[in-house]
């Protein structure tokens, strides 16, 4: 035009924009909840003005470890895919182990029963975990014995030990088990017949007649609730107080041992022994002297004598 004539053609190219979409890195200490971060950063040439995309971030990490912070995107309606070369880069989600000490307190259960002659038992333990920790009873296993049984009076232990408990959750790197053993205690029952609830009966020892020998008279003690006659020196002891040879009253002190406790007393008598004196019959004509006759004594203990 004007001072010029002729024509020629010039071409040019509109190139695609290079866009990099990068999801966020994130990290936290394990707390039992999922670690997520839905931030996506647009880099490279970025989107043209008023163009963009929406994002669906699906990355999640709950347990100790790491994983990609995955996501998907969808271009908005005014944004043509043909105008872009889009590269996705996933960030890293990392959960680290709880670094503080977790103390798990195991307390074996305890119970006390009075002796009845039947088996008693205690089972189980209670768990207490450091306040504020997310550690739970399901995070460890128990491989020991948590039940104790017994019949006789005494104390029985479960045998709980720290090594019976194992942490199975790698999210916690410092778990300590503090264990108090469980126990069953069976206390002796009263042996006193006057304690009606005890069900104990005792016979009265028989009286004896003096014979010059020791009279250590027995008695029978029965536990009517177990249906058993008690055994001397296993269930009780006997102490004889007083002279057990000569005439008088003897006291027996009965003291419970083993499965029985307490004491009571019984008494019996050693009564006088009867003896007879028989004299012979005799006669004479008076001569101013005394008439005497022999005789015999019956019922006297050998080695003893009576004068008359």
List where the protein language model places each region:
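Solvent-exposed beta-strand/loop surfaces, strongest in extracytoplasmic domains of secreted
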Residues: 1-308
């Amino acid at each position: 035009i004007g001072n010029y004539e002729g024509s020629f053609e010039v071409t040019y190219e509109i190139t695609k924009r290079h866009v990099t979409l990068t999801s966020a890195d994130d990290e936290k200490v394990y707390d039992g909840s999922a670690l997520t971060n839905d931030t996506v950063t647009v880099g490279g040439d970025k989107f043209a003005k008023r163009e963009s995309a929406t994002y669906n971030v699906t990355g999640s990490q709950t347990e100790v470890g790491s994983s990609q912070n995955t996501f998907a995107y969808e271009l908005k309606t005014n944004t043509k895919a043909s105008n872009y070369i889009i590269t996705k880069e996933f960030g890293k989600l990392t959960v680290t182990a709880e670094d503080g000490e977790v103390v798990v307190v195991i307390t074996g259960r305890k119970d006390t029963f009075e002796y009845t002659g039947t088996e008693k038992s205690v089972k189980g333990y209670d768990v207490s975990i450091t306040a504020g920790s997310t550690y739970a009873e399901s995070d460890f296993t128990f491989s020991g014995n948590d039940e104790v049984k017994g019949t006789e009076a005494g104390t029985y232990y479960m045998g709980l030990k720290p090594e019976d408990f194992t942490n199975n959750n790698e999210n916690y790197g410092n778990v300590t088990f503090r264990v108090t053993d469980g126990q069953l205690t069976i206390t002796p029952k009263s042996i006193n017949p006057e304690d009606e609830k005890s069900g104990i009966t005792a016979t009265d020892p028989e009286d004896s007649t003096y014979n010059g020998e020791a009279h250590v008279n027995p008695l029978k003690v029965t536990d009517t609730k177990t249906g058993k006659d008690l055994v001397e020196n296993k269930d009780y002891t006997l102490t004889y107080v007083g002279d057990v040879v000569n005439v008088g009253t003897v006291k027996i002190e009965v003291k419970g041992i083993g499965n029985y406790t307490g004491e009571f007393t019984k008494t019996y008598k050693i009564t006088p022994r009867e003896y007879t004196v028989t004299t012979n019959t005799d006669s004479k004509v008076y001569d101013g002297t005394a008439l005497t006759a022999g005789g015999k004594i019956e019922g006297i203990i050998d080695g003893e004598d009576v004068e008359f």
